[in-house]
C-alpha cells in the first residue's frame, strides 16, 4: 500500500490469505489451475511476481458467486434469514453502541426495524458519489453516511479506488462505466500517440490507432516506470492516463481514453 496501509492489518491479511483461498475453493470458486491440478498464479497490477489466484477474466464475479452460493446454503438450512429488496435507512444507537437498523422495504415502501446485538455494515464502496463510476448503482454512499451521522469514523474517505481499465466514456451524459478485467493490463501494453497532431486526428476519426507506426507510439508507463511497466498500481496507472489525456494526447472521440494493445499477446 505504498506505506499508507496499516502494517498490522496487512500482516494479518497475509497470514490468513491461504486459509481464505482454501475457503473460496471449498465454496466452489473455479480458480484457474495448472495442468497438474494445482492452483495457478499470475501477476496483477502493482505486483512484479506471479502471486495472484485468478478465475480467468472473471475473478471478482466468481468470488461473489461463491459467497452467494455459500450464503444460499445457510439460508436453505435455516441458519440465516435473508431479506431481499431492502435498503438501510439508519443505524439504531443505544448507549453508544449499534443495536440495529431501520430499513426500507423497496417493494411496499414501508419502514421496518431490526434489532441486533451487533451490526456489520458490508455495503461495499461509495463510488457513485462521483459522476463516473464502474460500481453498481446501489453503491451510493447512503449506508456509509448513515453510519457517519451516528458517530462512525472514516479511516480515509479520500482513498477511493480508481480503476484504470474500463470501457471509455462516450459523450457527456454517460455516468455508468463498464469495468474491464484487471488481468488485461497483464497481457496488454498501454500507449498514446507521441505526436499531438496524431491524437487530434484520432479524436476526429480521421485515422485509426493501427495507422500509427510503432516509432510514433508512446508506451508511457513502460517509459516512466521501467521496473513495473504496465503493471504499476492502479492509482499510478490512472493518474498517468489522466495526465496524458489532460496534456492533449488522449484518444477516442472524447480525448479521454488511451490504447491498450494486445497484439503481442495475440501473437504469442
Please describe what each predicted stretch is.
Residues 25-110, 122, 166-179:
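Conserved redox-cofactor binding core of oxidoreductases
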Residues 146, 152-268:
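An anion/pyrophosphate-binding glycine-rich loop and adjacent beta-alpha core
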Residues 9, 16-20, 48, 59, ...:
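General structural feature for long, well-ordered alpha-helical segments within catalytic domains
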Residues 129-150:
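A conserved FAD-binding loop/helix module that cradles the flavin
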Residues 1-13:
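Glycine-rich active-site loop/strand segments that organize a redox cofactor
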Residues 16-31, 143-157:
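Hydrophobic or amphipathic alpha-helical targeting/insertion segments
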Residues 113-124, 147:
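Short hydrophobic core segments
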Amino acid at each position: 500500500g505504498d506505506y499508507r496501509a496499516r502494517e498490522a492489518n496487512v500482516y494479518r491479511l497475509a497470514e490468513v490469505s491461504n486459509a481464505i483461498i482454501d475457503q473460496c475453493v471449498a465454496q466452489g470458486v473455479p480458480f484457474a489451475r495448472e495442468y497438474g491440478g494445482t492452483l495457478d498464479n499470475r501477476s496483477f497490477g502493482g505486483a512484479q511476481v506471479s502471486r495472484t489466484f485468478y478465475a480467468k477474466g472473471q475473478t471478482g464475479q466468481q468470488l461473489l458467486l461463491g459467497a452467494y452460493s455459500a450464503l444460499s446454503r445457510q439460508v436453505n438450512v435455516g441458519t440465516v434469514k435473508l431479506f431481499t429488496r431492502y435498503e438501510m435507512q439508519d443505524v439504531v444507537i443505544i448507549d453508544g453502541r449499534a443495536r440495529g437498523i431501520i430499513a426500507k422495504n423497496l417493494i411496499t415502501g414501508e419502514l421496518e426495524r431490526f434489532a441486533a446485538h451487533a451490526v456489520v455494515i458490508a455495503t461495499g464502496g461509495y463510488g457513485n458519489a462521483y459522476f463516473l463510476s464502474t460500481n453498481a448503482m446501489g453503491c451510493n454512499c447512503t449506508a456509509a453516511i448513515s453510519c457517519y451521522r451516528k458517530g462512525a469514523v472514516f479511516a480515509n474517505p479520500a482513498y477511493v479506488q480508481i480503476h484504470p481499465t474500463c470501457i471509455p466514456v462516450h459523450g457527456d451524459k454517460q455516468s455508468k462505466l463498464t469495468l474491464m478485467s484487471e488481468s488485461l493490463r497483464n497481457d496488454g501494453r498501454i500507449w498514446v500517440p507521441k505526436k499531438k497532431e496524431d491524437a487530434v486526428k484520432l479524436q476526429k476519426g480521421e485515422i485509426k490507432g493501427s495507422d500509427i507506426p510503432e516509432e510514433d507510439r508512446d508506451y508511457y508507463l513502460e517509459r516512466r516506470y521501467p521496473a513495473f511497466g504496465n503493471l504499476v498500481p492502479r492509482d499510478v496507472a490512472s493518474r498517468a492516463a489522466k495526465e496524458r489525456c489532460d496534456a492533449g494526447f488522449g484518444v477516442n472521440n472524447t480525448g479521454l481514453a488511451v490504447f491498450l494493445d494486445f497484439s503481442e499477446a495475440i501473437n504469442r
